[in-house]
Regions:
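Conserved ANL (AMP-binding/adenylate-forming) active-site segment centered on the GW(Y/F)…HTG consensus within
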Residues: 130, 172-192, 212, 228-252, ...
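Conserved AMP-binding A3 loop
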Residues: 1-14
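Gly/Ser/Thr-rich phosphate-binding loop
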Residues: 76, 81-85, 95-189, 203, ...
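AMP-binding/adenylate-forming catalytic core of the ANL superfamily
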Residues: 77, 84, 226-232, 242, ...
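Conserved AMP-binding/adenylation subdomain of ANL enzymes
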Residues: 13-30, 40-82, 97-102
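Conserved beta-loop-beta connector loops within the AMP-binding
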Residues: 178-223, 257-259, 326
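Active-site glycine-centered loops adjacent to acidic/histidine catalytic or metal-binding residues
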Residues: 1, 117, 147, 196, ...
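Thr-Gly-centered strand-to-loop micro-motif
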Residues: 33-34, 60-61, 115-116, 207-209, ...
Length: 344
């Protein structure tokens, strides 16, 4: 069920100021966004924030990016914008559709490219930076951030220029309350991206199911409070009751804190229980999309509760346009990848 998030002027102004400071936005900056103004990153992050800072902004039609993704960075090059944004799928869509010739773009003026609004993939960020090596784009410009509508927009940002920092952790460690330590072997692990520290005016904690704050590297519920956080949902008292705990908003995400910042492992409601362990759909999808010939964004993982109601039956959906006979081999490779990556 869709829920309306109520934001006050105080919420918006607090977060706009915090975003401006955290990203070190100055008078020499300018922005480019293809995200619609019906999206909080498009409206608040790349329309209201530039207005607040009195800097130029370029708005690109979303449909144009979908149909002709090359126009995105061509437009950035044309207007020499310094701040760009895209959810993770946008980087995949660009790389899948565009071949960048050496010398065809000059992106040396780009200071930050925000990556948010959905889970951030470290491998996608690395590939994007590698593809654009010849454009003058600094890999440290890639800027993974964390936020949600209930926080107006932003919750945590890394230090500008720090690039994409990640941590590989064992899949079996990603259960509530577990201490999550770096993986000693590359097998059966997932790479999580560091999403920085809370922006000014926003507090963040990681708690267990009883609301007790957990220590660093302990996986739990990500909760927030602050001037930027909504006071509740539109005409939905039950939603407010479910979301707010002693003044803290439960984001619905699971994650852990470290000295480097916040790491989010996934949505609490999306966790699958298979073979006695918790699994996150996006981790399995990410592993399958590394298979040769598998198209980005064409894999979805879900689950169906078993008849015994004891665990979930894993379901993998793949968009496949060739003849069905060819799919048999693809199914075998998917099974092999699941066994190798996660023992499923």
């Amino acid at each position: 069920e869709p829920k309306g998030v109520v934001l006050s002027h105080t919420n918006l102004l607090a977060n706009i100021q915090a975003i401006s400071r955290a990203a070190m936005i100055g008078r020499d900056d300018s922005t480019l966004s293809w995200m619609p103004l019906s999206h909080d990153m498009g409206l608040i992050g790349f329309h209201m924030v530039p207005l607040f800072n009195h800097i130029d902004q370029v708005l690109m039609d979303t449909e144009l990016f979908v149909r002709r993704p090359a126009r995105w960075l061509e437009t950035a090059c044309r207007y020499r914008t310094s701040l760009l944004c895209s959810p993770n799928f946008g980087y995949q869509h660009y790389m899948q559709s565009v071949s960048v010739a050496a010398g065809s773009l000059d992106l040396s003026h780009v200071r930050l490219i925000f990556n948010g609004a959905e889970p951030v993939s470290a491998s996608v960020c690395r590939e994007f930076a590698q593809r654009l090596e010849g454009t003058g784009l600094n890999a440290s410009a890639l800027y993974p951030v964390y936020g949600l509508a209930e926080a107006s927009l932003a919750v945590s940002f890394p230090e500008p220029g720090s690039g994409v920092q990640s941590l590989s952790v064992p899949l079996e460690a990603l259960s509530m309350g577990n201490v999550v330590m770096p993986a000693s072997r590359p097998e059966r692990c997932v790479e999580l991206v560091c999403l920085g520290h809370p922006v000014e005016g926003c507090e963040l904690r990681v708690c267990d199911q009883n609301g007790r704050t957990l220590s660093d590297y302990s996986l739990g519920h990500v909760q927030i409070r602050g001037d930027n956080v909504s006071g509740g949902y539109y005409q939905c008292p039950q939603c407010d009751e479910n979301a707010f705990i002693d003044g803290w908003l439960d984001t619905g995400d699971l994650g852990f804190m470290s000295g480097r910042g916040l790491f989010v492992s996934g949505r609490c409601k999306d966790v699958l229980f298979v073979n006695g362990q918790n699994w996150y759909p996006q981790d399995i999808e990410q592993a399958l999309q590394q298979m040769p010939g598998m198209e980005a964004g064409k894999v979805a993982v879900g689950a169906l509760r078993s008849e015994s109601n004891a665990e979930d039956l894993l379901l993998v959906f793949i968009q496949f346009r060739r003849q069905l006979d060819y799919f048999v081999e693809t199914a075998r490779r998917v099974q092999a990848a699941l066994a190798e990556h996660a023992g499923l």
